[in-house]
Amino acid sequence: MEIATKAGIIGALSRRFRPFVRFMFPRIPKGHKANEHITTNLIANILGLGWAATPAGLQAMEALGELEDERGNDRSIASDEMCTFLIVNISSLQLININIIAYRSQYGSVNPTRIVGAGIVATVVSTIVGCAYCKIKNRKARR
């Protein structure tokens, strides 16, 4: 991830993800460090780099906790943003699941990448359902 960051790949992908992050997390102020950590986590997950997504995810939750402190809310109670981030993160949209391909190759699969298509479909569906659920839940909570 550090190489991708220095090469400008993460920055370029982050700009493309900004509209999605603003849509899913409208209450996070522009320029807040939580946005950067959330975006980095999403990019790492999409690229199938779960090991690289974990630190960014932990940093995102910490930044969201700090945001709750700034708002004067109890940090020990999960905010809507924390719940949304957790659901989007768990749904884990992935284009290429490097780990599954590696395991299939290691255990002698004739075509270890055959799972990629089904994996993309499954993670796209789970992410869409998760995002829709969060938007509906958050809209009802604000009424």
For each of these PLM feature ranges, what is it?
Residues 34-45, 78-88, 110-117:
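The feature identifies polytopic integral membrane transport proteins across all domains of life
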Residues 19-26, 30, 66-77, 139-143:
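Intrinsically disordered, low-complexity non-transmembrane regions of multi-pass membrane transporters
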